[in-house]
C-alpha cells in the first residue's frame, strides 16, 4: 500500500460532527455495503453515499483512481473479517478489518447522522504495543498536559525521568496525516518508543496529538486555507513554549525532533524561535513533493516485477500531480489532485515556497540528521540535500542506518509498505545516537 497516499487520504478526509441517529449495527452494516461496492468497483454506488463535502473532495473519477491505485499495490479486496464502531465528535467511525490479496488492511469509514459517508481511508491493522527492551518504565513517569490555547488546545504526554532535575527536553513532531501522539502505524508506535527510551536515559520528552487528528471535524471546513503552519508549526512552537515554563526542564536545552514531514519542517520551526537549542531531523525530505510522489509510485510498481500496463495509470496520475504541483498558474482556491486526493492550493503553495535545506543552512544551532538507508519514501537523494547545505557547519552531525526503513525499524528485502505492518521498535542504535547527541549539547 502506498503509505504516502494513505496519509494524504487520512489528512484530507476530515470529519464534522452531528448527533448520530442510527445505531452501531446500522453503521457497521452500511460500512460493509460500501466495502462490497468498492470490491465490485461499483464506484457510482459508493459516490452516491457521500455527503456533500466528501462528494466534492472525491468525485467519481478520483474515487476510481484512488481505489485502482490501492488494488495495484495490495490486490483485490477479498473478505471483511470483522467490524467495530465508535462515536467521535458526533460521527460514527467504523473500522473494517479486511483481507486484500497481498496484505491485511483496515478500511475506516466515517458516517454522519444520516448514514452518509463523510470520510474514508485505509490504515494498517493494529496490534498490541510492547515496550522496547531499551525502555525502563521504573526510570520515568508520565503526565498528561495541554498544549496551546483555545480553540486549538491539544492533549499531550510529558514523559519525565525520575530524579533530581533539571533535565534536557525533546519535543516530538509527527509526519504527514492526522497522527496521534505516538505516531502510530499499525502496531508500531515510534514516538512512544522514543519517549520511553529517551526518558530512560534522563531526557524529558513531550509528544502530543496532532491538530488535524484532534480537531478533524473543525478542519474539514478549514481545508481550503490549511498550510503546514496550522497543521504543524504553530503547535510545535506551543509545545516548546510549554517546556520553557517547566522548572524541571533545563534552560536552553530544549530540542525539536521532527520525523518525515516534521523533519522537513524542523528548520522552519526553529527559525526565529530562540527557545530551541537544536533540532533532530529524522527522514526529512529536501526535494519537491511532486518529485517524491512520482519516484515512490514507480518504486512501488516495480516491487511486482517489470512495470507493466497495469501500473501505467497510477504512474501517469503521479506525473500529472507533479506537473500540477509545480504549475506557475496555481492560485489560491484551486486544488491539486494527488492520486485522486485533492490538496488545497494554499497547502501546495506554502510547501513550494519553503526550502528545507536552505533554511537549515541559515541556522546556527546544533543539528542531528538521521536517515534509514532502506527508506524508500525519503531516500538518499533527500539526505544529499542536507549534506550539501550543511557541509560547512561544524555543529551538524549526520548519521545513516543500514537496513532501517522510514520508521527507523528493520526493513524487508526489498523494502515495502509491508514493513510498517510488522510489530517492531525504533532501532536501539538510533535511540542511543539521539540520547548521546542530546547529552553532548551543553549550554554555553
Where are these regions (language model features)?
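Alpha/beta-hydrolase active-site loop
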Residues: 225-247
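Short solvent-exposed beta->alpha transition segments
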Residues: 28-29, 44-90
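Alpha/beta-hydrolase fold nucleophile elbow
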Residues: 248-260
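N-terminal cap/lid segment of alpha/beta-hydrolase-fold proteins
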Residues: 127-165
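Cap/lid segment of the alpha/beta-hydrolase catalytic domain
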Residues: 172-231, 298-301, 409-420
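Accessory cap/linker subdomain of secreted extracellular hydrolases
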Residues: 278-362, 392
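Catalytic active-site module of serine/aspartate enzymes centered on a nucleophile-bearing elbow/loop
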Residues: 404-407, 412-444
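Short beta-strand/loop motif that positions the catalytic acidic residue
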Residues: 363, 369-371
